[in-house]
Amino acid sequence: MNNRPIRLLTSGRAGLGAGALITAVVLLIALGAVWTLVAFADGCPDAEVTFARGTGEPPGIGRVGQAFVDSLRQQTGMEIGVYPVNYAASRLQLHGGDGANDAISHIKSMASSCPNTKLVLGGYSQGATVIDIVAGVPLGSISFGSPLPAAYADNVAAVAVFGNPSNRAGGSLSSLSPLFGSKAIDLCNPTDPICHVGPGNEFSGHIDDYIPTYTTQAASFVVQRLRAGSVPHLPGSVPQLPGSVLQMPGTAAPAPESLHGR
């Protein structure tokens, strides 16, 4: 038997090796196209962040929410959509239940229209309280609304909240939520009087110290949850090159730490 190594491509001719190479390239392109179709069918992103802004911030996802989303996109390279929770983030803080209902309605809609999109929930300050309600976490002994039905819990890949007032009432979302405890990160700057009980508090610790340290830390946590999630199952068998590993686009960068919020 001839044990000489096979040359896939030579300068003088394109033989079987070249044909195999062309087939391999076409196959890889086809596989990539299939995965792209799964991720972006009907305009659905790879992941989507539903974020509730802090008190007094204009409609949108707020400064902390934007920094969090920017870091998440940078670390994953994924197509990440954004949904700003629609509620009145007033100083009286009477509309958390409205925000929770809006977030829950959107989660249900996404679960129906984009079942392969991994959903991420987030909130800052009063917005964290909105997400507490969605997650079934009461503020003290008081419940302000109905949580997300358990049937939709698997659609949520991760939860990240910042400056959460519930921490002053004796517990964090990550420790109290029956739906999302293990999927959640609840970050409180130790000088933030909104979420921290003790000496050394300054209101600047709530306003100025979550970006970029804590938003980056939260993004790193969420990246791990997104990558740990199940890969969409493709119907039918898809041929795979021997020894090849199918890898989703986007490479996670090392996660730094930092502060800022509202």
UniProtKB/Swiss-Prot annotation:
GO terms for molecular function: carboxylic ester hydrolase activity. The record marks Q126 as: Transition state stabilizer. The keyword tRNA processing does not apply. Residues 241-262 are annotated as: Disordered. Disulfide bonds join C44-C114, C188-C195. GO terms for cellular component: extracellular region. InterPro entries: AB_hydrolase_fold, Cutinase/axe, CUTINASE_1. The active site is at S125, D192, H206. Residues 1-41 form the signal peptide. The keyword Ubl conjugation does not apply. It is found in: Secreted. It comes from the Bacteria. Keywords: Disulfide bond, Hydrolase, Secreted, Serine esterase, Signal. It is an enzyme of class 3 (hydrolase). Its EC number is 3.1.1.-. SUPFAM superfamilies: alpha/beta-Hydrolases (SSF53474). Its main location: secreted. Belongs to the cutinase family. This is Probable carboxylesterase Culp3. The gene is cut3.
